[in-house]
Each structure stands twice: as C-alpha cells, then as structure tokens.
Amino acid sequence: MADFNQILTPGDVDAGIINVVNEIPEGSCHKIEWNRKVAAFQLDRVEPAIFAKPTNYGFIPQTLDEDGDELDVLLITRQPLATGVFLEAKVIGVMKFVDDGEVDDKIVCVPADDRDTGNAYNSLADLPANLIKQIEFHFNNYKALKKPGSTKVTHWGDVEEAKEVIRESIKRWNER
C-alpha cells in the first residue's frame, strides 16, 4: 500500500479544498487507524455497536494535530465510504474536541464535487441540526462505558477557524 503522507498533499487550504483519506466508514464500530510507521490501515479496537461512527472518519495527509496523529476529519456523505478511499473535500467547519485532556479537533467536510446535494453544504449551518446533535452526542459519550467524562466537544467553529486549525497542523507536520 502506498503511504498517503508521501503521495498526497494536504490540499489547497486557502481555497477550503483538502485531501482526505477515509479510515472508518460511517456506521462502523471498527476503530480503524492509519498506522504511519508501516503505511497501512490497522484495526485498533472494536467499539460497542451503539457507538458506531455517525459520519465517515478520516485524516488529512501531511498534518499533525496536537495529539500527535494526523488531523482528523468528519466527512459527510449520503453513503459510507470504504477504508482507504481518498478524495478532495470542501471544508465546512471544525468540531473543537478534547480527548483525555488532549486537543483532538475534527475538521468537518463534504466531497468537493457533490452533485447529489447540488454542492449545497458550505458551512455547518447548512447541515441538518439533528446531525450536529448526533455527532456531538457520539463524541461526548463514545468512551463513557470505559472512561466516563474523558471526552468533550468544546465548540463548533466556522470555515475560517477550520482552515487555521489545518494550517497549524501542517506547520506541526513540517516541523516534526
């Protein structure tokens, strides 16, 4: 398997278009992660079925979040995407998140060319309010059976805040 951090750039952040590699399909309870050391996907653990991912979950290549992993992405699509699929995506916001005391932000995006929705999603405000609630509930509670209170969505940010999070993550990658 090719190393996504070698073959893909983060994308055109200023234009709000990023490259995304999908790790976990929407609806999956398998915690699949990109293992940078071996350049392959790895099953980290199986979550309880009630904590299946509410969206596709992936990362932006050549970025590092404050937790030391590639910057996470919540990718909104009508149907689940397979592990290993990569695409250009449009940034629509950021979910500011703390996991076990570490910043672990999630960039929220949609496919850059989404003819199904007519490219209707340009900001978090364009998403169904109930989807935002479901995502927030998931991330506030998905570790509750093992470590109650260890995760917290602190707030939702707009496209510009998301771009700044991405820029900082690119800087961390380049300085590693």
From Swiss-Prot:
Q: Outline the subunit composition.
A: Homohexamer.
What protein name does the entry list? Inorganic pyrophosphatase
EC number(s) on record?
3.6.1.1
**A Pfam family per the record:** Pyrophosphatase
Q: Which UniProt keywords apply?
A: Cytoplasm, Hydrolase, Magnesium, Metal-binding
- Cross-referenced InterPro entries, in alphabetical order? Pyrophosphatase, Pyrophosphatase_sf
In this chain, Mg(2+) 2 is annotated as bound at D72
Binding-site residues, substrate? K31, R45, Y57, Y142
A biological process term (GO) from this entry: phosphate-containing compound metabolic process
Q: Which Gene3D superfamilies match?
A: Inorganic pyrophosphatase (3.90.80.10)
Q: Which cofactor does it need?
A: Mg(2+)
- Where found, per UniProt? Cytoplasm
Q: Which HAMAP family match?
A: Inorganic_PPase
Which organism was this protein described from? Haemophilus influenzae (strain ATCC 51907 / DSM 11121 / KW20 / Rd)
* Family statement: Belongs to the PPase family.
One GO CC term, this protein:
cytosol
Answer whether the UniProt record assigns the keyword Hydrolase to this protein: yes
**Is the Flavoprotein keyword given for this protein?**
no
Source taxon at top rank: Bacteria
Q: Which residues does the record give as Mg(2+) 1 binding sites?
A: D67, D72, D104
Give the catalytic activity: diphosphate + H2O = 2 phosphate + H(+)
Role summary = Catalyzes the hydrolysis of inorganic pyrophosphate (PPi) forming two phosphate ions.
Question: For this protein, what is any one GO molecular function term?
Answer: magnesium ion binding
